[in-house]
Amino acid sequence: MDAELRYHTLLEAARHVYEGHAELTDFVPFPKDVRRQPIVPQAHPCSALFQNDDALKSVAYPDLQQAIVGAAPVAHWRETYKDTDIGADFLTRFGCYCIIGEGGPYLSSDIRLYMVYMPAHFYYPWHHHPAEEIYLVVSGSALFKKGMCADEVLLPGQTSFHKSNQPHAMATQEEPVLCLVAWRDQFETPPVWTPQMDVADGTRDAAYAEGVR
């Protein structure tokens, strides 16, 4: 399958799932101004890990998972946190690429759409950003944490909404997680760590104690 077909298959699979999910369309409708843009694929150590993770078995959205995996070899994998002190383990095992937006094969003025992958026993520390955000679990599960809210474990089909600059974090346990993630408004500012939340919450130490690396 050539790259163009992989991108098209990914877009249509994402569109189908997105438009069929009320919480996503309420967040922001799937854009009508989607247009193709040039993309330079960028490899990432996490790509092979993601493509070979047999624990990802989406019953809810098998076509979307297959399309996300299928586009992985020709995606521009993001390195959002490469200039931070997060460490090599996080940088090599956290996976994200854009579907609609900067670095993605498609562009829109209304939305940014990403895939996010985390292997089993993985911790994504507290962070925040001006853009409002919604996560949809495609396959697997994860513990979602956000400021001033109770923790919750989300399964395929469930969502987590993050307000502008609301700190949030994630952790996987016995299984990985694959998510479709949408942003609206204030796309220009990337996420930054919220280290004081890790200290106050004790999440990092607790996660490590439970076997989350």
State each model region's role.
Residues Y135, T159-H162, L178-V181:
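Active-site scaffold segments
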Residues E102-G104, F122-Y123, Q166-H168:
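Short beta-turn/strand-loop junction motif enriched in small, turn-promoting residues
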Residues D2-S109, A207-E210:
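A short, N-terminal "cap"/entry segment at the start of jelly-roll beta-barrel domains
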Residues M148-P167:
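Short acidic-glycine-tyrosine-enriched beta hairpin
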Residues D110, M115-H121, H128-F144:
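Short, conserved beta-strand element in jelly-roll/cupin
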Residues Y7-H8, Q173-R213:
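Double-stranded beta-helix
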Residues H129, G147-C149, Q173, A182:
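Surface loops and adjacent helix of pleckstrin homology
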